[in-house]
From Swiss-Prot:
Signal peptide: none annotated. It is an enzyme of class 1 (oxidoreductase). This is 5,10-methylenetetrahydromethanopterin reductase. Pfam families: Bac_luciferase. Belongs to the mer family. Keywords: Cytoplasm, One-carbon metabolism, Oxidoreductase. It comes from Archaeoglobus fulgidus (strain ATCC 49558 / DSM 4304 / JCM 9628 / NBRC 100126 / VC-16). Gene3D superfamilies: Luciferase-like domain. One of its GO terms (biological process) is lactate metabolic process. It is found in: Cytoplasm. GO terms for molecular function: coenzyme F420-dependent N5,N10-methenyltetrahydromethanopterin reductase activity; oxidoreductase activity, acting on paired donors, with incorporation or reduction of molecular oxygen. Catalyzes the oxidation of methyl-H(4)MPT to methylene-H(4)MPT.
Length: 332
């Protein structure tokens, strides 16, 4: 099992550098930095991390082909690959409709746009002159002035068609899920995409991009995950909620609690609205032994990399060290 860790660049650069170096020293293989317009620029932060780390692979988790051209993405991730000595990975997904609406971008044809963008980025990073007459993107001989080399591309996916696309075109898939049932459902579409491309599953990285919270005290770990889990529950599509047997009343209670938190500041009500069942479904939370048990279940469902996403734990530093000391050595 490979291990990744996600960070949001909502902190100062030196704080992010500290946590990523701590993760590297703790045995993590990958760090994924989120890419949102309202946070610090992902490639600026990745440049610092590339210079200050030695072994950890690093990249955006995830960027998108709407607010930045594939040509600029290829140049940016190619630069990170050069600076880091070949450690760059590119996470790219279709993005978030609500966020795009806030910045005046129309979210349309995500499958088509993703396919074209990934095909173009791969050609550019391999040093090719790109002639591409797509429905979305049209390139007429564009070429980077340097050759970054082969950079693994991971595609963020949830729905059946995007999962198939990720397996067909990508080196890995990033799936926002923490429960083995979600990966059992995804397996059929991943296998279909791999078969279409004539690729082996052994050469493909299936990533559980999970909410994780670890502490020696089980209750502290699980309570730290409640707010994050509330947002996941509120944003999950009906198919996912039905898959896990969550009642409409329970989900609506979480949504109402979040609304009260935003309007009245009642975040305690949000934590109370999240059931233990929801924590089990939408996060990997508990003691190191609890987390190991869940990761073993995910491995049986085809997962080959687990990403520790927010909140990581009640104390981020201690939780990273705990994962490195008591979880990673037992699963690698």
């Amino acid at each position: 099992m490979k291990f990744g860790i996600e960070f949001v660049p909502d902190m100062k650069y030196y704080e992010l550098e500290y946590y990523v170096k701590l993760a590297e020293d703790s045995g993590f293989d990958y760090t994924w930095i989120t890419d949102h317009y309202n946070n610090r620029n992902v490639y600026s932060m990745l440049t610092i991390l590339a210079l200050k780390t030695r072994t950890i692979k690093l990249g955006p988790g995830v960027t998108n082909p709407y607010h930045i051209s594939p040509a600029l993405t290829a140049s940016a991730i190619g630069t990170i690959n050069e600076i880091s000595g070949g450690r760059a990975v590119l996470g790219i997904g279709a993005g978030d409709k609500v966020t795009f609406e806030r910045i005046g971008i129309t979210w349309e044809k995500p499958l088509k746009r993703m396919r074209e963008a990934v095909e173009i980025i791969r050609q550019l990073t391999e040093g090719k002159a790109v002639k591409y007459d797509g429905e979305i993107f049209k390139f007429n001989g564009a070429k980077l002035g340097f050759k970054p080399g082969s950079i693994p591309i991971y595609i963020g996916a949830q729905g059946p068609k995007m999962l198939q696309l990720a397996a067909e075109l990508g080196d890995g898939v990033l799936i926002n899920a923490s429960h083995p049932k979600d990966f059992e459902v995804a397996k059929e579409n991943i296998d279909a995409g791999l078969a279409k491309a004539g690729k082996s599953r052994d050469a493909f990285d299936t990533v559980a991009y999970a909410s994780m919270s670890v502490d020696k005290d089980r209750d502290k770990a699980r309570n730290a995950a409640r707010i994050v889990v509330a947002f996941i529950v509120a944003g999950s599509p009906p198919t996912v909620l039905e898959r896990h047997g969550l009642s409409e009343d329970a989900v609506n209670a979480v949504r109402e609690a979040l609304n009260n938190a935003f309007t009245k500041g009642d975040w305690g009500g949000v934590a109370k609205s999240v059931t233990d069942e929801m924590i089990d479904i939408f996060s990997i939370s508990g003691t190191p032994d609890d987390v190991i048990e869940r990761i073993n279940e995910l491995s049986k469902a085809g997962v080959t990399q687990v990403v520790a996403g927010s909140p990581i734990g009640p104390d981020k530093k201690k939780s990273i060290q705990l994962i490195g000391k008591e979880i990673i050595p037992k699963l690698k």
